[in-house]
């Protein structure tokens, strides 16, 4: 296909792909997906060489969420098989950081359920961050829902390195999956994060019934925002949620989406997270010809694969893991 001609060279030179070209990328025939991966891989190698980063998270507050996100097990609107609990202790947050270091994660994210963390919760998390930064050689991220500038300043002083807040899908499609808050609220939160000078991590979930245009709109929004990290999640249908019986993704469809985000956001980290194992299947390793980061050690309400398998993959692919500001080859031990 013509869209594949000199595609990587155009992106590397600084050319911005158009929405029409994005539509062509997502409609590439399955037999040409490996050619698309090759082009996107050239872009990844140019900007990130052979480096790979692991991150890990702690589900620091689970369930009882007032929001009605159709994909989420933690919403109080649905009957789902989860164990709700309040904010964990500082010791538990520190223990999570220790586990993250042990699996060679370069980042550790403290995640809480709910639309917005309370002032008390922010204070406790900030206190834990200070202790983590003194104790462990790891970058600390937070995902606390909607945050105001005072909270962000407090977290920044504590030593947080990055804030996660996902847009999830396009502005046009968002109201189809969430009714209790707006896409604009999430967008404004990202702008606040950038305003205080913190690194941004913001991504999406795919397989929720969105169109090709929705996917491209999200990729272009992140390009306009110049975000640092884009976590890509692929729907894990959760019984009890409105999307509990939806599963229309194929591995090749996932590869097209990953390649699209790399080509539209060449300088952003492309981080594969929830649903990567379930949806990519035998193409899992191939996806990391394009992506350069991953979430290791499990997700919020679902287990991932053993971290050792991700290290084995990094070794097979000849990648160097980034850890504590340096990169190293994964040993065979």
Swiss-Prot record:
Its EC number is 2.8.1.6. InterPro entries: Aldolase_TIM (IPR013785), BATS_dom (IPR010722), Biotin_synth/BioAB (IPR002684), Biotin_synthase (IPR024177), Elp3/MiaA/NifB-like_rSAM (IPR006638), rSAM (IPR007197). Keywords: 2Fe-2S, 4Fe-4S, Biotin biosynthesis, Iron, Iron-sulfur, Metal-binding, S-adenosyl-L-methionine, Transferase. It is an enzyme of class 2 (transferase). GO terms for molecular function: 2 iron, 2 sulfur cluster binding; 4 iron, 4 sulfur cluster binding; biotin synthase activity; iron ion binding. Binds 1 [4Fe-4S] cluster. The cluster is coordinated with 3 cysteines and an exchangeable S-adenosyl-L-methionine. Its cofactor is [4Fe-4S] cluster; [2Fe-2S] cluster. PROSITE patterns: RADICAL_SAM. It catalyses: (4R,5S)-dethiobiotin + (sulfur carrier)-SH + 2 reduced [2Fe-2S]-[ferredoxin] + 2 S-adenosyl-L-methionine = (sulfur carrier)-H + biotin + 2 5'-deoxyadenosine + 2 L-methionine + 2 oxidized [2Fe-2S]-[ferredoxin]. [2Fe-2S] cluster binds at residues 109, 141, 201, 271. Residues 47-276 form the Radical SAM core domain. Pfam families: BATS (PF06968), Radical_SAM (PF04055). Gene3D superfamilies: Aldolase class I. GO terms for biological process: biotin biosynthetic process. Pathway: Cofactor biosynthesis; biotin biosynthesis; biotin from 7,8-diaminononanoate: step 2/2. [4Fe-4S] cluster binds at residues 65, 69, 72. Homodimer. Belongs to the radical SAM superfamily. Biotin synthase family. Catalyzes the conversion of dethiobiotin (DTB) to biotin by the insertion of a sulfur atom into dethiobiotin via a radical-based mechanism. This is Biotin synthase. It comes from Sulfurihydrogenibium sp. (strain YO3AOP1).
């Amino acid at each position: 296909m013509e869209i594949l001609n000199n595609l990587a060279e155009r992106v590397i030179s600084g050319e911005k792909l158009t929405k029409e070209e994005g539509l062509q990328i997502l409609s590439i025939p399955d037999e040409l997906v490996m050619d698309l991966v090759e082009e996107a891989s050239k872009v990844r190698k140019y900007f990130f060489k052979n480096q790979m980063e692991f991150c890990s998270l702690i589900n620091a507050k689970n369930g009882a969420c007032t929001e009605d996100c159709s994909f989420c097990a933690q919403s109080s609107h649905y009957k789902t098989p989860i164990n709700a609990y309040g904010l964990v202790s500082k010791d538990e947050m520190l223990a999570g950081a220790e586990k993250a270091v042990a699996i060679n994660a370069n980042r550790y994210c403290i995640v809480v359920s709910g639309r917005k963390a309370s002032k008390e919760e922010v204070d406790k998390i900030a206190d834990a961050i200070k202790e983590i930064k003194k104790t462990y050689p790891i970058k600390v991220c937070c995902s606390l829902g909607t945050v105001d500038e005072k909270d962000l300043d407090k977290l920044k002083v504590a030593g947080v390195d990055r804030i996660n807040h996902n847009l999830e899908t396009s502005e046009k499609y968002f109201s189809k999956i969430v009714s209790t808050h707006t896409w604009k609220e999430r967008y404004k939160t990202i702008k606040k994060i950038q305003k205080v000078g913190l690194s941004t991590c913001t991504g999406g979930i795919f397989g929720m019934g969105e169109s090709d245009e929705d996917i491209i709109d999200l990729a272009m929004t992140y390009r306009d925002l110049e975000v640092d990290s884009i976590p890509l999640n692929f729907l894990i249908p959760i019984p009890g949620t409105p999307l509990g019986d939806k599963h229309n993704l194929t591995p090749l469809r996932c590869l097209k989406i990953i390649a699209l985000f790399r080509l539209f956001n060449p300088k952003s980290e492309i981080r594969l997270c929830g649903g990567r194992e379930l949806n990519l299947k035998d193409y899992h390793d191939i996806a990391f010809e394009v992506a350069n980061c991953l979430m290791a050690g499990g997700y919020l309400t679902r287990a991932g694969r053993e971290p050792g398998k991700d290290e084995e993959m990094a070794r097979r692919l000849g990648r160097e893991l980034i850890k504590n500001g340096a990169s190293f080859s994964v040993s065979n031990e």
